[in-house]
Amino acid sequence: MNKGMIRALVLAGVFLVSTVVFSFLTNKTNPDMTTELEEATLPTVQLYYKEQKINELYGYVDEMNAVYMRDSITPIDTDRLLPIRVQNGSYAVDELSYEIRSMDTKRLIADTKVDSYSQKNGVITADLPIQNLLDSNAEYLLIIHLLHGDDTLNYYTRIIEPQDCYVKESIDFAKDFHEKTFQKDGSGSLATYMEPDSSADNTTLANVSIHSTLRQVTWDKFNGTVLTDPSVSIKEINNSYNVILLDYVVTATGDNGELEYYNVEEYYRVRYTNDRMYLLNFERTMDEIFRAENDDFYENYLQLGICSSDVEYKSNETGSILCFVKEGELWCYNATEKKLSQVFSFRGYEGIDSRENHKEHDIRIIKVDETGSADFVVYGLSLIHISEPTRHAQIS
């Protein structure tokens, strides 16, 4: 399955959290209004395979159509135990259970309540016993349920009992490749796997591929530091190849000493043989988290930093008000007043939380009118328990 199909299936699984209508006035005598979500509170579920953390799952407050919940696939080890860690923090979990179904959801294979688990410092640790009812190299659906009072949170992944698929070797290869891209002295071995040609754009770090130069793959002149450990997600497992994604955040120091943040995603399609690992495809995307520093404005241009050219934006008919979406945030710029406002953000103000800083939610701008009013929709995974769809706060 290629990367575009993977993303399409992810989008098919997201659901509408809330529709937010926001109006902000650009006159200095009127306060700007912004819509904020509460900080993320719903637990995340982390799965493990051979002591490697994989496939961090985010909860759905509604029951989804599991047929379309194909974002990740989780290998089951030979002991038929699936270790999980629930990062629940202050969110009370009254009961933990799971079910296993056929991929079309019609056949229920297991429906089990987990009685044996430990809970300490806001973390639940458990081993899910997977019944000896799975065929090797066949995919099934695993749905984990967390009961909280009258509410149930649902977490979805595919599972497989891999045979001769070499999943751990593929993960280790991807992690080693990733680390070597930051090692200028030890990166020469990566050239073995690259296929440079003229199809790659070697002028930007926003999109790097197997066809890029080794210089681009090793970050060219960018002097960044990895802020978060790469989050490993497995997208495909079979005898021919495995697909591994690594997500992480890097930081760098800007020209004026300000700290810059970048979301990075690496895509690996690899094949194992007895002789060596083959890299069938590699892609890396890099997107700067917009911070609205003074040097982001240059003449009549607004500089968004290193990012994809595919930016969601809309303006009013006269072009005096421009709204755009950047890495989970909605910004609006008044060209007449030369004022920039952050209208909405999934992120809180304290650091970068993986529940807020992921790509399974987004913002769509509906319209921008001449008065400076912008209508937009927020959609994707629900990371907070919402009793009211929106709330309003003042921005100075």
Feature-to-residue mapping (PLM):
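Short beta-strand elements that form the blades of beta-propeller/WD-repeat-like
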Residues: E312-K326, W331, T371-L383
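Structural signature of eukaryotic scaffold interfaces centered on beta-propeller domains
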Residues: G305-T318, K359-S373
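Single conserved hydrophobic/aromatic residue that forms the stacking wall/gate
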Residues: I384-I395
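Short beta-strand edge/turn micro-motifs at domain boundaries
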Residues: P31-T35, L42-T44, G59, R107-L108, ...
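Short solvent-exposed beta->alpha transition segments
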Residues: D185-S233
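Short, compositionally biased P/S/T/A/G/V-rich stretches that sit at domain boundaries
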Residues: F24-D77
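Beta-propeller fold detector
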Residues: S341-G348, S396
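Short, aromatic-enriched amphipathic alpha-helices that serve as compact interaction elements
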Residues: Y166-L190
